[in-house]
């Protein structure tokens, strides 16, 4: 929509996008930046993990159809309104199998967070990573906290539910770091996450 406001002509056909620019347009335009999809998805998963109801406002739930559907299938209690989503924990989470895919599929940048939720679900859950290599760097750290996870090729097998115990763990990247924070929220005893500077790249004032 920003490009269209500048006068560009955009044509989308299948996986091909054609953009015809408009260099003659010098008019000022106003455009509102949308919320961060991955940051919001992280908080949705946090809401499914924690005890109290969480309400996330000023978002467009239509952008999260896949993520919300996954959380609903796992048993999370979700209510959707025009510009907000409320989510709360279900003590009897269900296992699920997912695979990462480019938008509008399930994002690779949420699989680490979802894996934490899967550790609390009954039965065997699976995540197949189709986007990046070496995307399961958080698994050894989650296992240190008591998670039962196996990696075979590009698929993670998560056995649950597992009782997580606080430990000193190390963040290897942005999404791995926030997954360890989520695990620490539900773990027994204190969790220390080292290399926390990774978080600052994607989460503003996460501690608040």
Annotate each language-model stretch with its function.
Residues 1-208:
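Short, structured segments at the rim of ligand-binding sites
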């Amino acid at each position: 929509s920003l490009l269209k406001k500048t006068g560009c002509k955009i044509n989308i056909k299948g996986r091909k996008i054609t953009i015809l620019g408009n260099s003659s347009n010098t008019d000022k335009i106003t455009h509102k930046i949308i919320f961060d999809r991955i940051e919001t998805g992280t908080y949705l998963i946090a809401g499914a993990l924690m005890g109290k109801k969480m309400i996330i406002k000023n978002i467009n739930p239509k952008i999260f159809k896949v993520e919300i559907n996954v959380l609903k299938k796992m048993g999370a209690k979700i209510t959707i309104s025009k510009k907000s989503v409320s989510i709360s924990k279900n003590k009897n989470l269900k296992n699920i199998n997912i695979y990462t895919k480019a938008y509008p599929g399930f994002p690779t940048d949420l699989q680490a967070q979802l894996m934490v939720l899967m550790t609390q679900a009954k039965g065997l859950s699976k995540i197949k990573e189709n986007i990046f290599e070496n995307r399961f760097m958080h698994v050894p750290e989650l296992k240190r906290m008591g998670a039962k996870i196996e990696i075979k090729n590009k698929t993670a097998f998560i056995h649950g539910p597992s009782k997580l115990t606080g430990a000193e763990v190390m963040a290897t990247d942005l999404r791995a770091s926030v997954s360890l924070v989520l695990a620490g929220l539900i773990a027994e005893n204190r969790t220390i996450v080292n290399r926390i500077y990774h978080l600052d790249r994607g989460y503003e004032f996460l501690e608040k």
